[in-house]
């Protein structure tokens, strides 16, 4: 079973014509309704994350500043991250959505729970909002689960087009958390981080695994490299709990990346991950082409809901030839991580 954690209150994070605006979630929910799928899904309401929950990840200064900034009317926190008068409260609700999704998987008969929330979170560091993100929703949920349930090892897979620098920074020294991110080459896209060499530090070295993909990478390129990495990583790391950071901005129709994924990637990754982890919490991040996001989201939800694990049906037709550059990237990852994983 799969549950969606969603609230219309997320629309109160008013951002005007900013790319990260309320139409993102509206397009998803409207499409689910139009396709007759909404009534087939269990929709759960989130509750705001407590200050205690958030402060396991973020500094008091960060939380107080967000609150004060919003209450004073909001505006741009940096060159591209916007907050409105209600954004602080809605960001707490978004973090609470990720916690609620985690609770559903841990306490009820749900294999998958999907926090369909905004603002997104994976660029938010412990002390800074950035990249459209105010509070790191997934990190807050993970630390909640670690504290409440005593689970020790976690795996996070992030396929947003942009590297989740905030999530990576928060857990960079932690050997109990494996963060895997596949994203567009950081030479060519925000935030300019996420190179293979950024592999964790101290005891956490070897547990921050970046897969930087060149602009123009297609579904077949992603499938080639993920088939070589994910199964080994999930099998050898042996996590107690799994999170998935969901980003639709790698789609070929998305205006904020130069990747060329098609609709088939999203059901494919849903099929593939089901074979690697029996339960999983999904947390929405990016995606800025409303139509592509709505279509791809539904396809991914369907394979999770219906327990479809036949990946072959989603293999991109006529794209069997993988660029040599992709093979070189895998070889570099294989060599760099050889002390940690047997890719």
Residues covered by each model-derived region:
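N-terminal low-complexity, Ser/Thr- and acidic-residue-enriched intrinsically disordered segments
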Residues: 1-53
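A general "terminal functional-core" signal
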Residues: 3-5, 10-13, 64-343
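Residue-level detector of secondary-structure boundary/capping sites
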Residues: 19-23, 45, 57, 89, ...
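Basic, low-complexity intrinsically disordered segments
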Residues: 20-21, 61, 241
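N-terminal, well-ordered alpha-helical segments
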Residues: 26, 30, 52, 56, ...
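Charged, often glycine-rich, active-site loop that binds/positions anionic groups
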Residues: 47-71
């Amino acid at each position: 079973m799969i549950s969606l954690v969603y609230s219309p209150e997320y629309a109160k994070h008013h951002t005007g014509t900013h790319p990260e605006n309320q139409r993102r979630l509206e397009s998803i929910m409207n499409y689910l309704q139009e396709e007759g799928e909404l009534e087939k899904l269990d929709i759960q309401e989130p509750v705001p994350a407590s200050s205690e929950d958030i402060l396991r990840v973020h500094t008091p200064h960060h939380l107080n500043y967000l609150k004060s900034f919003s209450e004073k009317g909001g505006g741009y926190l940096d060159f591209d991250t916007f907050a409105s008068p209600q954004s602080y409260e809605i960001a707490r609700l978004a973090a609470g959505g990720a916690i609620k999704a985690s609770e559903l998987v841990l306490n009820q008969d749900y294999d998958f729970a999907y926090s369909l929330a905004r603002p997104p979170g994976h660029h938010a560091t412990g002390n800074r909002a950035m990249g459209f993100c105010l509070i790191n929703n997934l990190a807050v949920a993970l630390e909640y689960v670690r504290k409440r349930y005593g689970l020790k090892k976690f795996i996070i897979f992030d396929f947003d087009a942009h590297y989740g620098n905030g999530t990576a920074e928060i857990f960079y020294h932690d050997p109990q958390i494996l963060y895997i991110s596949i994203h567009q080459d950081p030479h060519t896209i925000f935030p300019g981080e996420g190179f293979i060499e950024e592999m964790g530090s101290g005891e956490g070295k070897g547990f921050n695994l970046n897969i930087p993909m060149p602009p123009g990478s297609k579904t077949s390129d992603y499938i080639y490299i993920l088939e070589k990495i994910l199964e080994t990583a999930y099998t050898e790391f042996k996590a107690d709990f799994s999170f998935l950071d969901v980003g639709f901005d790698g789609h070929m129709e998305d205006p904020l990346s130069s990747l060329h994924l098609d609709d088939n990637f999203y059901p494919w990754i849903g099929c593939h991950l089901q074979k690697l982890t029996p339960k999983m919490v999904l947390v929405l991040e990016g995606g800025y082409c409303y139509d592509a996001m709505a279509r791809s989201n539904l396809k991914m939800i369907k394979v999770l809901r219906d327990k479809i694990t036949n990946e072959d049906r989603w293999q991109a037709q006529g794209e069997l030839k993988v660029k040599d550059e992709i093979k070189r990237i895998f070889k570099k990852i294989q060599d760099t991580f050889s002390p940690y994983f047997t890719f």
